């Protein structure tokens, strides 16, 4: 049988071509890995920025809501002293509300979608709000005898809301 001999120039060209293709393949894999890492980092940064923005919005919405409750409380003190009418005070409070329509729903949506870890703490706030509002909606008589208890419940509400604001700040630091 005849032996087939391959000229060295062809063999050198084949080896060079294979080496080049292998180098391109390795380079592409490294580039692909770098791009994947870069994309993941950019996605993480965008996600953190969105969460920070939503946390700021939630904080502002919470403060407006809290201020409305506090203003209602302050307006109700004369009702407990017998110096004002509860219906007139509630009307004045609703006309001068800091919240806009849908603010509380927006707050709840942000809480549930972005910060579910805060739902329990906000539940404590809502429970305390319910106690305070019993004094404002006729659940507990607006008499001078109940004024001290009303003020104590409002002070407890303010402590709970301060604790919730602190938890919001903690989340901001963690982001």
What are these regions (language model features)?
Residues 21-175:
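Conserved non-transmembrane functional hotspots
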Residues 1-19:
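Short hydrophobic membrane-inserting helices
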């Amino acid at each position: 049988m005849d032996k087939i001999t391959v000229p060295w120039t062809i063999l050198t060209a084949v080896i060079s071509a294979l080496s080049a293709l292998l180098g391109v393949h390795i380079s592409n894999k490294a580039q692909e890995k770098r791009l994947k890492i870069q994309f993941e980092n950019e996605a993480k940064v965008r996600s953190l920025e969105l969460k920070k923005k939503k946390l700021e919005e939630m904080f502002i919405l919470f403060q407006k809501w809290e201020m409305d409750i506090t203003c209602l409380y302050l307006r109700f003190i004369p009702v407990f002293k017998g110096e004002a009418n509860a219906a007139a005070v509630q009307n004045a409070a609703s006309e001068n509300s800091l919240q806009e329509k849908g603010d509380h729903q927006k707050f709840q949506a942000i809480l549930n979608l972005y910060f579910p870890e805060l739902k329990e703490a906000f539940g404590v706030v809502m429970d305390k709000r319910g106690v305070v509002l019993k004094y404002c909606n006729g659940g507990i008589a607006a008499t001078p005898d109940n004024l001290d208890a009303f003020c104590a419940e409002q002070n407890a509400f303010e402590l709970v809301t301060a604790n919730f604001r602190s938890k919001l700040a903690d989340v901001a630091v963690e982001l």
